[in-house]
Amino acid sequence: MLEVLPIQDKQEQEALCARCGIEFRTELLAYKALVDGELRGVCQFTMGADGGRIVDFAHVTDGYEFEPMFVMGRAALNFIDLCGVHRAYFDAPCDNETLIKAIGFSRNSDGRYEMDLTDFFKEPCKHSKN
């Protein structure tokens, strides 16, 4: 079973980040993706006046699965949107452009991955660029 859950304990966040090969940053919010109770990935993100930012988005070092990563990315964006922040950026190192675009991001004129979350979760299919 696929689960995407917030990481509420900073010690757990630090341990899970290590398993995904990313630096733990205490000031960041985080989600974890699990399949049948096994960690598949971690997303660390933040929100500010300029929008939400996915800072780290990494799968476990011993494997990659598209679906848990996709759902985790959408969950982080939904949380950002529910907090009243309606612009998001994907600033995490990630070489999987297909995944980044599937989550909903596209490059802006500066080459940065960005998306407008306004009404995105009311009708996500309406926003598809495919």
Q: Predicted segment positions?
A:
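Conserved acetyl-CoA-binding loop-helix of GNAT-fold acetyltransferases
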Residues: 64-81
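Short glycine-aromatic motifs
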Residues: 2, 28, 104-106
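Conserved acyl-donor/pantetheine-binding loop and adjacent beta-alpha core of acyl/acetyltransferases
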Residues: 19-24, 44, 56, 118
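Conserved GNAT acetyl-CoA-binding A-motif
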Residues: 80-93
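Conserved active-site alpha-helix within GNAT-family acetyltransferase domains
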Residues: 93-111
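C-terminal "cap" of GNAT-fold acetyltransferases
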Residues: 109-130
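Conserved donor-binding loop and adjoining core beta-sheet/short helix segment
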Residues: 29-67
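Short amphipathic alpha-helix that is part of the acyltransferase structural core
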Residues: 1-25, 124-130
